[in-house]
Amino acid sequence: MVGLGIMGAPIVQRLCDKGYDLTVWNLEPDYYDRVKDSGAQWAASPAEVWTASDIVLVCVLGDDAIENVCLGKSGFASAGKAAKLLIDLSTTSPEATLKLASRLKDETGARWLDAPISGGPKPARDGELTVMVGGDSAVFKEAEPLLRKIGQNVTHMGDLGFGQKTKIINQAIVGANYILMAEMLATCRAAGIDPDLLPVCLKGGLADSAILQRIYTQMSAEDFDPPRSYVRQVNKDLKSVTHFVDDLGLDLPLMDVAIRQYHRYADAGNEMEDGASVSRLYQTTDAPK
């Protein structure tokens, strides 16, 4: 595994519990403390992870980061030819996926699956993630037993890049709902409704959702420490949504408004706050415009 962040570390712990021998690397070496007790072995570089492993999982922050671990100094390609399988759990652009998969195959012979994940740290630790996979169907079948150790819902969405396309749509739904939950929390408070009763009342109805039960509840309790996700990550993903939609020639005004609101919160110096803390935008007397 390369990447021991909010999602990478619990995935390592989960796979070690399931009997896998893992070699790991992270840009900040002190992150190894998160998984040391699980039995994972530290490597000095991505190249060392590549050399030591049959399957390499990557869970890093965006296009630049995955390009660096693949093609940068001491990256995977520097380790030379090897018939490896790379599974990219990161949220990256479909364009970067196609470009890097082609380059890495040319330089090392490696196969590639884009398999971005959704669910959060606890589902990652418990093996209950949602995994959306793009790539060759035979390669997917080879990797599926491993992916099902970390995901309760693993779906092959199509060719290489289709996992990332699906994740962009996932993030659009999540990001828009962050704003909707924040606005409905503010509405409950303004109307004198006990905000904690809303998810109880709506449970099982058409308005119920995982986001209502988890994210809205987190917002209502102002339970943002430690972060379960970072504003910078959600904001980055929503920028990807904008590019994706623009490239398709679509006009989605509801999505545009939600994205602008989230950008506004991120740009106010909140990038390292919990992603759900965007509800703080609405803790003023004047609703944001």
Predicted feature locations:
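Rossmann-fold dinucleotide-binding core
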Residues: T92-Q171
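Conserved beta-strand segments of alpha/beta enzyme cores
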Residues: D21, Q41-W42, L85, R111, ...
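NAD(P)+-binding Rossmann beta1-loop-alpha1 motif at the extreme N-terminus of oxidoreductases
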Residues: M1-C59, K84, S90, P121
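Rossmann-fold NAD(P) dinucleotide-binding segment
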Residues: P46-R111
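Amphipathic alpha-helical hairpins
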Residues: I6, P10, E48, I55-L57, ...
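Helical "substrate-binding/catalytic lid" subdomain
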Residues: F162-D286
